[in-house]
Amino acid sequence: MDKLLLWMFVFTSLLSEAFCQTDLKRKVFVFPRESETDHVKLIPHLEKPLQNFTLCFRTYSDLSRSQSLFSYSVKGRDNELLIYKEKVGEYSLYIGQSKVTVRGMEEYLSPVHLCTTWESSSGIVEFWVNGKPWVKKSLQREYTVKAPPSIVLGQEQDNYGGGFQRSQSFVGEFSDLYMWDYVLTPQDILFVYRDSPVNPNILNWQALNYEINGYVVIRPRVWD
């Protein structure tokens, strides 16, 4: 009986470290190396397909190559929703395997706050970088983003929950992830940029369900 209780305690402790719901305010996920394994799996509050969304987060990286920032895959479609940084000042959004790319001014080796919105009825895509809107584009008008998803940080999924490549991995710090099933107003996006998010209902950095896989650590955020 004592051995059984000890085993249950160890198993519970390991499970709680790997899969957690945590308030990560003023903290970051650190992805300290290139790899084809290190990632964080997110478990969203999402049971139905998406007609609209807003997704915001902060990154701090010295990578100059392309990298995956947010990978949302469903069975049969690896790039159902993907935010991909092509290079400094250039981002792509994939919806249902199709993509659009936006470009703007961005300072290298500085923290970045990124918000992306998409509205199905119009197809309009907006990128806000450090509180400033970039040129609007259109993508997949009247499309519906499928669910349930596999959501991964740190890697780009080439199949549902896997298919990672070192050359697409994110290296750096990741923080303040929030997601809504509607398009935020410009004023609300500025609130998010200033660290005052407005009731996120899909992903909430201050009550995040996540599972760490590989070499990813949590540290205080020491930059703004």
Swiss-Prot record:
Q: Which residues form the Pentraxin (PTX) domain?
A: 25-224
Q: Which GO-annotated molecular functions does the record name?
A: calcium ion binding; carbohydrate binding; complement component C1q complex binding; identical protein binding; virion binding
Cofactor(s) it depends on:
Ca(2+)
Co-factor note (free text):
Binds 2 calcium ions per subunit.
Q: Where in the cell is it found?
A: Secreted
- In its keyword annotation, does this UniProt entry include Acyltransferase? no
May I have one GO cellular component term? Answer: extracellular space
Q: Which residues bind Ca(2+) 2?
A: 156, 158, 168
Glycosylation: residue positions? 52
Gene Ontology terms: biological process: host-mediated suppression of symbiont invasion; negative regulation by host of viral glycoprotein metabolic process; negative regulation of monocyte differentiation
Question: What InterPro entries does the record tag this protein with?
Answer: ConA-like_dom_sf (IPR013320), Pentaxin_CS (IPR030476), Pentraxin-related (IPR001759), Pentraxin_domain (IPR051005)
> Span of the secretion signal?
1-20
Where do the annotations place Ca(2+) 1 binding? 78-79, 156-158
Per UniProt, the keywords (alphabetical) are: Amyloid, Calcium, Disulfide bond, Glycoprotein, Lectin, Metal-binding, Secreted, Signal
Taking the first listed entry, what is the main subcellular location of this protein, grouped into a coarse class?
Answer: secreted
Subunit: Homopentamer. Pentraxin (or pentaxin) have a discoid arrangement of 5 non-covalently bound subunits.
* Family label: Belongs to the pentraxin family.
Q: Which PANTHER family match?
A: C-REACTIVE PROTEIN-RELATED (PTHR45869), SERUM AMYLOID P-COMPONENT (PTHR45869:SF5)
Q: What is this protein called?
A: Serum amyloid P-component
Organism this protein belongs to: Mus musculus (Mouse)
